[in-house]
Amino acid sequence: DKYGIIAYTVPLLVYTNLDREKQDGLNRVMNGESYTWVNDVIQSGVTVLDSQTGKILAIGAGRNKTGVNQLNLATSDEIKRQPGSTAKPLFDYGPLIEYNNASTYGYNDNGEYRLFVDGPYSYTNGPAINNWDGTFMGEMSIRRALALSRNIPALKAFQQVDDENIIEFVSNLGIDPEEHSGSLYESVSLGAMEGGVNSLQMAAAYAAFSNGGYYNEPYSVSKIVYRDTGEEETHKEVKRQAMSDATAYMITSILDDVTVTG
């Protein structure tokens, strides 16, 4: 579609970014050869990207798929899912650091950095908000709150940033912020989205954190060659700065902690 070509009728050589080793490894996971799934009902969609370029290196389209014209669970716009807590760096802490000069320690209160309090709290329109384990942990840094995926500090971080800034931040990362007349529902701070996202969108958005704040539009085909004429069309990378390198560094540092203490 991108090149306006009907691939079934035009002789082409198509050069993709597929990394055979990574794709074979992912296939073994999806097929249950190198990972034990609980049952055959559980589905999965996986995208493996080169964070520096946006090249799609491997795709896990789903499990137990046979036949043709099957939906690709990794990239389909028809089967998007709510991102849950993976939305917190995108909607909450990333914008707080980028626009409100927060640090990994705490939020900026007129030049003084303060800890968030993980305690009883409610959404602006009234309903109480809880953590996944039903407990409260008191004062904590942004680093600890994100590493432990606490909901209440995440909502408080979201509430401190102007909606227009969050919309800009998320949009620059290729995610539809689902704004309503310029405003956002507070539930998106915890990943409760109406339309949802797919793994391709999330992989590309997160890649910007490890790429100095630069977002690369993901792509799978690097070049096509018309066999009849030898004419080539090469992909032109789409790259933009989505956030400062300082914000990207701090979020990446916190996410590193998730693998250790989260």
Locations of regions flagged by a protein language model:
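Flexible glycine/proline-enriched surface loops and loop-helix/loop-strand junctions
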Residues: 7-12, 70-78, 137-139, 147-154, ...
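A penicillin-recognizing enzyme superfamily signal
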Residues: 16-36, 46-48, 59, 66-79, ...
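Active-site SXXK
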Residues: 26, 54, 81-116, 145, ...
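Mid-domain, small-residue-enriched loop/turn segments at the edges of structured enzyme/sensor domains
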Residues: 127-130, 162-204
